[in-house]
Design a protein with these regions (language model features):
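Glycine-/small-residue-rich beta-strand-loop submotif within the FAD-binding core of flavoenzymes
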Residues: 121
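Short glycine/proline-rich turn/loop motifs
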Residues: 7-10, 28-30, 126-127
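Conserved helicase NTPase motor core
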Residues: 14-118, 130-137
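Proline-centered turn/helix-capping motifs that create local helix->coil transitions or kinks
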Residues: 1-6, 38, 93, 148-160
């Protein structure tokens, strides 16, 4: 996004350098959007940032309108989203974000985990409230998750715990493919049906 905001020529370069079919499809898609007066999600983020950057009066209007900002799933925000939030909240401190750096799974879609990891540096004076009690899982499951998360090289340190019982020991299923995994789970469910009804099982 940084590069696209600074140089609109990049969009044309992207079109020219793609294989012909993809280039043509994307060009038609962009034309259709323009004809319909529509924007997709990425367009909304890009154009909002350009609007706020190039028209300070518009930015100020929205800063006055959105005096308090709450962002959920902050670990999954991308650079453009981070910049919109920063522009809206800069200098005011009326920002609350909720997120878990251990649950960032959308980097393939452009999510930038640094948005949450560096939040304290980006917003000095902020308060961090760690919600470390897990209401859903047994302690054995939580311990296993903690042991894996602890190996993350960049993280916000936390010690998650459960107030539930220790629970059954975990069993690891190693599969060569998603099909093999699905078959193994289905076979286990089929086997367990003798001990309990399907209604008492969860996958």
């Amino acid at each position: 996004y940084k590069a696209y905001e600074q140089n609109k020529q990049l969009i044309e370069d992207d079109l020219r350098n793609k294989i012909p079919l993809v280039r043509d499809i994307y060009a038609r898609y962009q034309n259709r959007c323009q004809q319909a007066g529509a924007m997709d999600f990425d367009d909304l983020l890009l154009q909002t940032n350009l609007l706020f950057r190039d028209h300070p009066d518009v930015l100020e209007k929205y800063r006055d309108y959105f005096q308090y900002v709450l962002v959920d799933e902050y670990q999954d925000t991308n650079f453009a989203q981070h910049l919109i939030v920063k522009r809206l909240c800069e200098g005011r401190g009326n920002l609350c974000v909720v997120g878990d750096d251990a649950q960032s799974i959308y980097s393939f879609r452009g999510a930038n985990i640094d948005n949450i990891l560096q939040f304290k540096q980006l917003y000095p004076g902020c308060q961090i409230f760690k919600l470390e009690r897990n209401y859903r899982s047994t302690q054995n499951i939580v311990n296993a998750a903690n042991s894996l998360i602890r190996k993350n090289t960049a993280q916000i340190p936390k010690q998650v715990y459960s107030e539930k019982e220790e629970g059954s020991k975990l069993q690891v299923l190693s599969s060569y493919s998603d099909y093999e995994e699905a078959y193994a789970v289905a076979a286990r469910v089929h086997e367990m049906r003798r001990q309990m009804p399907y209604a008492d099982m969860a996958v």
